[in-house]
Amino acid sequence: RDPNLGKVMLYQLSYFRIWRTGAKINSFPVSAKLGAAAFFLAVILGVSAGVIAALKQNTKWDYTVMGLAMTGVVIPSFVVAPLLVMIFAIILHWLPGGGWNGGALKFMILPMVALSLAYIASIARITRGSMIEVLHSNFIRTARAKGLPMRRIILRHALKPALLPVLSYMGPAFVGIITGSMVIETIYGLPGIGQLFVNGALNRDYSLVLSLTILVGALTILFNAIVDVLYAVIDPKIRY
């Protein structure tokens, strides 16, 4: 039996006691800021790339976007992160190769890109497939027959149903970004929850590891619940 499990409901885990004293309170904002930035970057760039590929189906734009997306999916973040450091920090000297410095933008760019790249690729592929399916539906043909501008058709009629599969993917993407941040924060030396988790595991601080696992699990459940609510709001077919 693990005595720490019984203390969860009593708010007595060692990490939470440290959290209440403020000793480790700075770790969570670092991970939250990086994760939120990577998540929104993945959604914005992924949806944009997917829509462009769908509208330019079977053209060089489509092949280029899907080729880059396939590359982004198969290359893991722990390979992308050192490559970005080598290119942009060591060779070109454009960006710092690590550190946080209060969350300055130039210190966030490389870890944010490394963390979001695979999800940009996945969202682009999902958006493309969904958008192509929507563009061949009857109500889009009707809108075209009425002479509506293509821009209005995309923004007013096609985009919303095409984003439903993307919305379903946001839950797993959020979980992946949380777990992936552990690797990224360690590589870039960021003082976030991920690095705290790795240090706790290496130092055999099981109370800390258990506490962080519970925290990540709670955030995952919360975000999946939010996604389910948003899905019901956007898609009236599944409302009860």
Language model segments and positions:
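N-terminal, intrinsically disordered charge-dense segments
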Residues: 1, 19-26
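Short clusters of hydrophobic/aromatic residues that line enzyme substrate/ligand-binding pockets
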Residues: 5, 94-95
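Short, small-residue-biased leader/transition segments that mark boundaries at the very start
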Residues: 11-14
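Alpha-helical transmembrane segments of integral membrane proteins
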Residues: 28-61, 77, 90, 100-240
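Membrane-interface segments at loop-to-transmembrane junctions
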Residues: 64-68
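A hydrophobic, multi-pass inner-membrane permease signature
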Residues: 72-80
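Phosphate/pyrophosphate-binding betaalpha-module
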Residues: 84
